[in-house]
A protein has these predicted regions:
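N-terminal beta-alpha lobe that positions the nucleotide/phosphoryl donor
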Residues: 1-239
Length: 239
């Protein structure tokens, strides 16, 4: 159990290789035809081509990555970030291939990738959360207004699968609610394939608090904490 297949490229792959080297692990770097000859590949113990330049045919090609792991004898798969790093189907496929993904399980990815499910899990664990709806919103203007009044304006409407500022809209007053719901619902369906929406209290002057937890399957966990003032980008991505 000493070989890691790196399912990523460039600086990300380089950082993983350096970490593996410090831990005494052998590295296999998967690469697309477009990255053949790239300098970062020289640091890998082995490099293997997984397909043509388009990401769908290489870095997002699950069967090709699993085949690369089998051919090279890798026992671990590190997806880095981006590409397949938050893809629950990839995590499931890696587990079914009797390999170890360096990352969350498919179950956790599905849960935390849906903001409503993630918030429900946090509430169940006793984590303080921003006031909001208990689940997705009904397509009922009267019910929406009651919820918004209970929470208190301004509120923010958000898509459970949204991100990057898309699929969310701030509602300052009751007369804006119906139109904002319709637009956010349409955006969510268009960009994320799911028109579900949930509601939270909008924070006018938030602080961006980032919490990272590193844990293994045996229950050993380390908490890393970083708190800093919200940037414009973070304000546009209230979660």
């Amino acid at each position: 159990m000493d070989t890691v297949l790196i399912a990523n490229r460039g600086e990300i792959a380089l950082r993983i290789m350096r970490a593996c080297r410090r831990l005494g692990l052998r590295t296999v770097c998967a690469f697309s035809e477009d990255d053949r000859g790239a300098g970062y590949l020289d640091l890998a113990d082995q490099a293997i081509c997984i397909g043509p330049a388009p990401a769908l045919q290489s870095y997002l090609n699950i069967p090709a990555l699993l085949a690369a792991a089998e051919v090279t004898g890798a026992q671990f798969v590190h997806p880095g970030y981006g590409f397949l790093s938050e893809n629950a189907e990839f995590a499931k496929a890696v587990a079914q291939a009797v390999l170890t993904l360096i990352g969350p399980s498919a179950k956790i990815m599905r849960q935390m990738g849906d903001k409503v499910a993630a918030k429900q899990a946090m509430i169940a664990a006793g984590v303080p959360c921003v006031p909001g709806s208990a689940g997705v919103l009904p397509d009922d203007p009267d019910a929406l207004l009651r919820m918004a009044n209970d929470i208190g304006f301004p509120v923010i409407l958000k898509a459970p699968g949204g991100g990057g500022g898309r699929g969310m809209r701030v509602v300052q007053a009751a007369d804006e609610l119906a139109a904002a719901f319709a637009i956010t619902h349409q955006e969510a369906r268009q960009f994320f394939g799911n028109g579900d929406i949930y509601m939270e209290k909008y924070l006018r002057h938030p602080r961006h608090v980032e919490i990272q937890v590193i844990a293994d399957r045996y229950g050993t966990a380390t908490l890393l904490r970083c708190s800093c003032p919200a940037t414009v980008s973070a304000l546009n991505r209230q979660r």
